[in-house]
Amino acid sequence: MEISWGRALWRNFLGQSPDWYKLALIIFLIVNPLIFLISPFVAGWLLVAEFIFTLAMALKCYPLLPGGLLAIEAVFIGMTSAEHVREEVAANLEVLLLLMFMVAGIYFMKQLLLFIFTRLLLSIRSKMLLSLSFCVAAAFLSAFLDALTVVAVVISVAVGFYGIYHRVASSRTEDTDLQDDSHIDKHYKVVLEQFRGFLRSLMMHAGVGTALGGVMTMVGEPQNLIIAKAAGWHFGDFFLRMSPVTVPVLICGLLTCLLVEKLRWFGYGETLPEKVREVLQQFDDQSRHQRTRQDKIRLIVQAIIGVWLVTALALHLAEVGLIGLSVIILATSLIGVTDEHAIGKAFTESLPFTALLTVFFSVVAVIIDQQLFSPIIQFVLQASEHAQLSLFYIFNGLLSSISDNVFVGTIYINEAKAAMESGAITLKQYELLAVAINTGTNLPSVATPNGQAAFLFLLTSALAPLIRLSYGRMVWMALPYTLVLTLVGLLCVEFTLAPVTEWFMQMGWIATL
């Protein structure tokens, strides 16, 4: 029997999403204009909360759809303008180029990455040392590469690992739907579940590693560049200025990695099942045996392109996205990928997230137009100089957990610079505030996927449903890191930042401009 027109429309709306989720979004769309007529400020914060809700429910429905509907309505009712959204997109063009090209570029280096990380995984049998190595590697790479790039690398490796075992467990040699477990025996499902736990922990260690390394250098995160430019610091200056906070945080973060693995807290401690290790070992042995001279040349070419990638990013020879485009061109040309559809597969992972980030910029435009953060900024600047450092750090951390890091860092450094230029604070205090702003923006934001773009990218990637990594589970697994990084960072800002910076100046390592 044919269903009614209304029922058909309801089923099509947001597809397979639960009915309660569809109803909640409709209520949001009805309530927002009414609240906006009464209080634009309250409506602005309500929109932010609703957008966070769509991110939290990412596994129910990709946030681009509900978030996009909320953003379109916000522009339509006047919470912001289409022109302001365009300005925000233009201001963040580098980030969009990064997502479009750098993430796609990594796709053409997956053979090399899978080769390297397979050897790493098979050669290190201790889960603690393996977790530490993933965390350290991610931290080191994130000091030179964008965190999204590093996470994209680890995601591609994890999907490769998962795909290898899933094909064996399902007794299928060709590419299959990795989310389809219907052909897997009960015994294999138990092992697969343990393997998922193992991959979840590695992904979280690597994700936190990107935050540990990304905060240390001016090229580690997009907002770092903005803060460095506002303070007039170069690469070495930035590293030394941040080190009184970032070095102790890095050490404590790595110790936390070992601790949660040792004690099996917060969902960590799952080891690589021996059956999976055997499958990966067989795959590695078979791959090496079947590797032709042409395959070896591909690996060598990818390694050379990897050297070019790190060198170009470290020396900042061009914008990150353009370097990513050069990786695509070099890799496809030298490896021999010439078919348009084969090249197009590289963009499958990144473009939905690029669209989602563009929607997020419209929410940022609402935050600016409705001055949602103004009361907080005014409160902080009225405090004493000593209290300002901790307050800037704390409020940056709180806002960065629910908003865009680049936006929060930009707003605070601009306000601090304006206060310095007006004479409200000294140049020396401004430089200390720049450190507090940068560390406060980067460290506590690991608390939620909303705060770290790399975490959000992981949550909305094809890998997340495969390893059962939901929003809530990600927040839970990030909790020990959140507590350690936030508290150690706060203590360093409070007690070590000023005296160590003063000592650096006396040694002549840094100077006030």
UniProtKB/Swiss-Prot annotation:
It catalyses: 2 Na(+)(in) + 3 H(+)(out) = 2 Na(+)(out) + 3 H(+)(in). One of its GO terms (cellular component) is plasma membrane. Pfam families: NhaB (PF06450). It is found in: Cell inner membrane. It is a multi-pass membrane protein. The chain crosses the membrane at residues 23-43, 52-72, 97-117, 120-140, 144-164, 202-222, 238-258, 303-323, 348-368, 391-411, 447-467, 475-495. InterPro entries: Na+/H+_antiporter_NhaB. Keywords: Antiport, Cell inner membrane, Cell membrane, Ion transport, Membrane, Sodium, Sodium transport, Transmembrane, Transmembrane helix, Transport. GO terms for molecular function: sodium:proton antiporter activity. Belongs to the NhaB Na(+)/H(+) (TC 2.A.34) antiporter family. NCBIfam families: NhaB (TIGR00774), PRK09547.1 (NF007093). Na(+)/H(+) antiporter that extrudes sodium in exchange for external protons. This is Na(+)/H(+) antiporter NhaB.
